[in-house]
Protein backbone atom coordinates (compact mmCIF):
# COMPACT_ATOMS: atom_id res chain seq x y z
CA UNK A 1 0.00 0.00 0.00
CA UNK A 2 1.51 3.32 -1.05
CA UNK A 3 1.10 5.80 1.79
CA UNK A 4 4.03 8.02 0.94
CA UNK A 5 3.36 11.70 0.35
CA UNK A 6 -0.40 11.57 -0.03
CA UNK A 7 -2.15 14.02 -2.34
CA UNK A 8 -2.01 17.60 -1.14
CA UNK A 9 -5.27 18.01 0.70
CA UNK A 10 -8.03 20.61 0.46
CA UNK A 11 -6.77 22.04 -2.80
CA UNK A 12 -3.15 22.52 -1.79
CA UNK A 13 -0.83 22.56 -4.75
CA UNK A 14 1.29 19.47 -5.16
CA UNK A 15 4.89 19.25 -6.29
CA UNK A 16 6.41 16.81 -8.71
CA UNK A 17 8.15 13.87 -7.08
CA UNK A 18 11.26 12.30 -8.50
CA UNK A 19 10.22 9.00 -10.15
CA UNK A 20 13.47 7.44 -8.96
CA UNK A 21 13.12 5.85 -5.56
CA UNK A 22 14.88 3.47 -3.22
CA UNK A 23 13.43 0.12 -2.14
CA UNK A 24 14.21 -0.88 1.46
CA UNK A 25 13.29 -4.21 3.12
CA UNK A 26 9.80 -4.12 4.69
CA UNK A 27 9.39 -0.48 3.71
CA UNK A 28 7.05 1.23 1.30
CA UNK A 29 8.68 3.01 -1.59
CA UNK A 30 10.75 5.98 -0.42
CA UNK A 31 10.21 9.20 -2.34
CA UNK A 32 11.71 12.63 -2.12
CA UNK A 33 11.04 16.08 -3.49
CA UNK A 34 12.77 17.67 -6.44
CA UNK A 35 11.44 21.13 -5.62
CA UNK A 36 11.28 23.06 -2.38
CA UNK A 37 9.13 25.94 -1.19
CA UNK A 38 10.42 28.97 0.71
CA UNK A 39 12.62 27.86 3.59
CA UNK A 40 11.75 24.21 2.83
CA UNK A 41 14.61 23.10 0.60
CA UNK A 42 13.65 19.43 0.36
CA UNK A 43 11.52 16.76 2.01
CA UNK A 44 11.11 12.99 1.95
CA UNK A 45 8.81 10.38 3.46
CA UNK A 46 8.83 6.63 4.07
CA UNK A 47 6.85 4.20 6.21
CA UNK A 48 7.57 0.66 7.40
CA UNK A 49 4.85 -1.88 8.17
CA UNK A 50 7.23 -3.95 10.28
CA UNK A 51 8.17 -7.61 10.14
CA UNK A 52 5.14 -9.32 11.66
CA UNK A 53 2.25 -7.55 9.91
CA UNK A 54 1.03 -7.55 6.33
CA UNK A 55 -0.62 -4.13 6.66
CA UNK A 56 0.48 -0.61 7.49
CA UNK A 57 -1.40 1.73 9.85
CA UNK A 58 0.98 4.68 9.50
CA UNK A 59 0.03 7.78 7.55
CA UNK A 60 1.95 10.85 6.40
CA UNK A 61 0.86 14.42 5.63
CA UNK A 62 3.05 16.86 3.71
CA UNK A 63 1.49 20.21 2.81
CA UNK A 64 3.94 22.87 1.67
CA UNK A 65 1.41 25.69 1.44
CA UNK A 66 -1.73 25.32 3.54
CA UNK A 67 -4.75 26.76 1.75
CA UNK A 68 -6.24 29.79 3.45
CA UNK A 69 -9.81 29.18 4.66
CA UNK A 70 -12.20 31.56 2.90
CA UNK A 71 -13.21 33.29 6.11
CA UNK A 72 -9.59 34.15 6.98
CA UNK A 73 -8.05 37.46 5.94
CA UNK A 74 -5.70 37.19 2.98
CA UNK A 75 -3.72 40.13 4.34
CA UNK A 76 -2.92 38.32 7.59
CA UNK A 77 -2.32 34.87 6.09
CA UNK A 78 1.29 33.70 6.54
CA UNK A 79 3.40 31.24 4.63
CA UNK A 80 2.80 27.99 6.50
CA UNK A 81 3.82 24.38 5.87
CA UNK A 82 2.54 21.29 7.64
CA UNK A 83 4.33 17.98 8.12
CA UNK A 84 2.91 15.11 10.17
CA UNK A 85 3.36 11.42 10.87
CA UNK A 86 0.38 9.52 12.28
CA UNK A 87 1.35 6.23 13.92
CA UNK A 88 -1.90 4.29 13.89
CA UNK A 89 -2.82 1.30 16.05
CA UNK A 90 -5.85 -0.95 16.30
CA UNK A 91 -6.77 -0.12 12.71
CA UNK A 92 -6.07 2.73 10.31
CA UNK A 93 -9.33 4.71 10.59
CA UNK A 94 -8.04 7.23 13.12
CA UNK A 95 -4.76 7.81 11.28
CA UNK A 96 -6.69 8.25 8.02
CA UNK A 97 -8.98 10.79 9.66
CA UNK A 98 -6.06 12.78 11.07
CA UNK A 99 -4.17 12.75 7.79
CA UNK A 100 -7.16 14.14 5.95
CA UNK A 101 -8.39 16.63 8.54
CA UNK A 102 -6.08 17.63 11.41
CA UNK A 103 -4.39 20.51 9.59
CA UNK A 104 -7.77 22.00 8.74
CA UNK A 105 -8.94 21.80 12.35
CA UNK A 106 -5.86 23.83 13.31
CA UNK A 107 -5.95 26.58 10.69
CA UNK A 108 -9.71 27.14 11.05
CA UNK A 109 -9.34 28.15 14.69
CA UNK A 110 -9.98 31.80 15.51
CA UNK A 111 -6.56 31.89 17.19
CA UNK A 112 -4.77 30.99 13.94
CA UNK A 113 -2.41 32.47 12.81
CA UNK A 114 -2.07 35.00 15.65
CA UNK A 115 -1.50 32.34 18.35
CA UNK A 116 -0.33 29.06 16.76
CA UNK A 117 0.14 27.09 20.03
CA UNK A 118 -3.43 27.89 21.07
CA UNK A 119 -4.70 26.96 17.59
CA UNK A 120 -2.84 23.65 17.76
CA UNK A 121 -4.29 22.79 21.17
CA UNK A 122 -7.81 23.78 20.13
CA UNK A 123 -7.52 22.03 16.77
CA UNK A 124 -6.29 18.82 18.38
CA UNK A 125 -9.18 18.88 20.87
CA UNK A 126 -11.80 19.46 18.16
CA UNK A 127 -10.35 16.74 15.92
CA UNK A 128 -10.40 14.27 18.81
CA UNK A 129 -13.99 15.12 19.75
CA UNK A 130 -15.15 14.92 16.14
CA UNK A 131 -13.56 11.53 15.53
CA UNK A 132 -14.88 10.01 18.76
CA UNK A 133 -18.37 11.27 17.90
CA UNK A 134 -18.18 9.65 14.46
CA UNK A 135 -17.10 6.33 15.97
CA UNK A 136 -19.72 6.43 18.73
CA UNK A 137 -22.56 7.27 16.34
CA UNK A 138 -21.52 4.55 13.90
CA UNK A 139 -21.44 1.96 16.69
CA UNK A 140 -24.82 3.06 18.06
CA UNK A 141 -26.42 2.84 14.61
CA UNK A 142 -24.95 -0.59 13.89
CA UNK A 143 -26.04 -1.94 17.27
CA UNK A 144 -29.56 -0.53 16.83
CA UNK A 145 -29.89 -2.17 13.43
CA UNK A 146 -28.95 -5.54 14.92
CA UNK A 147 -30.91 -5.08 18.14
CA UNK A 148 -27.65 -5.54 20.03
CA UNK A 149 -26.79 -4.06 23.43
CA UNK A 150 -23.21 -5.34 23.72
CA UNK A 151 -20.81 -3.05 21.89
CA UNK A 152 -18.15 -5.74 21.35
CA UNK A 153 -17.44 -6.03 17.65
CA UNK A 154 -19.31 -2.84 16.78
CA UNK A 155 -16.86 -0.17 17.95
CA UNK A 156 -13.92 1.09 15.91
CA UNK A 157 -11.08 0.85 18.44
CA UNK A 158 -8.48 2.49 16.23
CA UNK A 159 -6.21 5.18 17.60
CA UNK A 160 -3.13 7.06 16.57
CA UNK A 161 -0.13 8.92 17.88
CA UNK A 162 0.82 12.13 16.08
CA UNK A 163 3.94 14.18 15.57
CA UNK A 164 3.26 17.47 13.80
CA UNK A 165 5.66 20.12 12.57
CA UNK A 166 4.03 23.41 11.59
CA UNK A 167 6.32 26.00 10.02
CA UNK A 168 4.97 29.55 9.96
CA UNK A 169 7.26 32.07 8.32
CA UNK A 170 10.53 31.50 10.24
CA UNK A 171 9.12 29.74 13.33
CA UNK A 172 8.83 25.99 13.82
CA UNK A 173 6.11 24.52 16.06
CA UNK A 174 6.47 20.87 17.07
CA UNK A 175 3.36 19.23 18.54
CA UNK A 176 3.47 15.71 19.93
CA UNK A 177 0.84 13.24 21.11
CA UNK A 178 2.21 9.77 21.92
CA UNK A 179 5.62 8.32 21.18
CA UNK A 180 6.36 9.30 17.60
CA UNK A 181 9.50 11.42 17.59
CA UNK A 182 10.83 14.52 15.91
CA UNK A 183 14.60 14.90 15.72
CA UNK A 184 16.85 17.46 14.09
CA UNK A 185 20.19 16.86 12.47
CA UNK A 186 22.70 19.65 12.98
CA UNK A 187 26.36 20.37 12.36
CA UNK A 188 26.45 18.39 9.15
CA UNK A 189 24.80 15.37 10.75
CA UNK A 190 27.28 15.16 13.61
CA UNK A 191 24.69 16.28 16.16
CA UNK A 192 21.17 14.92 16.60
CA UNK A 193 18.76 16.95 18.71
CA UNK A 194 15.44 15.71 20.09
CA UNK A 195 12.51 18.03 19.38
CA UNK A 196 9.83 16.02 21.21
CA UNK A 197 9.28 13.94 24.34
CA UNK A 198 7.78 10.44 24.30
CA UNK A 199 4.51 10.14 26.22
CA UNK A 200 4.98 6.85 28.06
CA UNK A 201 3.01 5.62 31.11
CA UNK A 202 6.13 5.17 33.24
CA UNK A 203 7.50 8.64 32.47
CA UNK A 204 7.28 10.67 35.69
CA UNK A 205 5.05 13.50 34.49
CA UNK A 206 2.69 11.14 32.70
CA UNK A 207 2.56 8.66 35.60
CA UNK A 208 1.51 11.39 38.03
CA UNK A 209 -1.22 12.62 35.69
CA UNK A 210 -2.54 9.11 35.09
CA UNK A 211 -2.70 8.07 38.73
CA UNK A 212 -4.19 11.41 39.84
CA UNK A 213 -7.06 10.74 37.42
CA UNK A 214 -7.67 7.20 38.73
CA UNK A 215 -5.87 5.44 35.93
CA UNK A 216 -3.57 2.48 36.54
CA UNK A 217 -0.15 1.61 35.18
CA UNK A 218 0.92 -2.00 34.90
CA UNK A 219 3.52 -4.20 33.29
CA UNK A 220 2.94 -7.67 31.87
CA UNK A 221 5.22 -10.57 32.77
CA UNK A 222 5.90 -13.57 30.56
CA UNK A 223 7.73 -16.71 31.72
CA UNK A 224 9.85 -18.20 28.93
CA UNK A 225 12.50 -20.95 28.82
CA UNK A 226 16.09 -19.75 28.95
CA UNK A 227 18.07 -20.15 25.77
CA UNK A 228 20.63 -22.36 27.52
CA UNK A 229 17.93 -24.74 28.80
CA UNK A 230 18.77 -24.16 32.48
CA UNK A 231 15.28 -23.09 33.48
CA UNK A 232 12.90 -20.22 32.93
CA UNK A 233 13.21 -16.46 33.01
CA UNK A 234 10.74 -13.62 33.39
CA UNK A 235 10.42 -11.20 30.50
CA UNK A 236 8.81 -7.86 31.32
CA UNK A 237 6.59 -6.24 28.72
CA UNK A 238 6.12 -2.49 28.21
CA UNK A 239 4.33 -0.37 30.78
CA UNK A 240 0.66 -0.01 29.89
CA UNK A 241 -2.28 2.13 30.96
CA UNK A 242 -5.68 1.04 32.20
CA UNK A 243 -8.23 1.77 30.88
CA UNK A 244 -7.08 1.18 27.33
CA UNK A 245 -4.19 -1.27 27.78
CA UNK A 246 -2.06 1.04 25.65
CA UNK A 247 1.70 1.45 25.90
CA UNK A 248 1.39 5.20 25.29
CA UNK A 249 -0.21 7.71 27.65
CA UNK A 250 -1.49 10.10 24.98
CA UNK A 251 -3.24 9.33 21.72
CA UNK A 252 -6.08 10.24 19.41
CA UNK A 253 -9.05 7.88 19.15
CA UNK A 254 -9.00 4.72 21.28
CA UNK A 255 -12.64 5.23 22.20
CA UNK A 256 -12.87 2.30 24.62
CA UNK A 257 -10.08 3.86 26.68
CA UNK A 258 -11.88 7.19 26.86
CA UNK A 259 -15.67 7.08 26.82
CA UNK A 260 -17.24 6.09 30.16
CA UNK A 261 -20.02 4.16 28.39
CA UNK A 262 -17.31 1.76 27.17
CA UNK A 263 -15.44 1.67 30.47
CA UNK A 264 -13.05 4.49 29.61
CA UNK A 265 -11.86 7.65 31.31
CA UNK A 266 -11.32 10.83 29.28
CA UNK A 267 -8.69 12.12 31.72
CA UNK A 268 -6.32 9.14 31.60
CA UNK A 269 -5.24 8.71 27.98
CA UNK A 270 -5.52 12.18 26.47
CA UNK A 271 -4.88 13.88 23.14
CA UNK A 272 -3.45 17.07 24.65
CA UNK A 273 -0.33 17.98 22.65
CA UNK A 274 3.02 18.94 24.07
CA UNK A 275 4.21 21.90 22.00
CA UNK A 276 7.71 23.26 21.52
CA UNK A 277 8.63 26.36 19.54
CA UNK A 278 11.90 26.93 17.69
CA UNK A 279 13.14 30.02 15.86
Name each model-derived stretch:
Residues 1-279:
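PP2C/PPM-type serine/threonine phosphatase catalytic domain
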Amino acid sequence: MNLIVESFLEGDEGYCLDPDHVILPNHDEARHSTKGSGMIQAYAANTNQGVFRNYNEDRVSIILNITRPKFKSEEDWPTCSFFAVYDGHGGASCADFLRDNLHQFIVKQESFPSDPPAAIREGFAEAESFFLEIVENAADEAMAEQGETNHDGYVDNSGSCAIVILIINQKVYVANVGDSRAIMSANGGRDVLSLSRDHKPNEEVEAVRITENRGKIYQTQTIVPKMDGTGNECILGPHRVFPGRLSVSRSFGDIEAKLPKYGGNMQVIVSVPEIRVFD
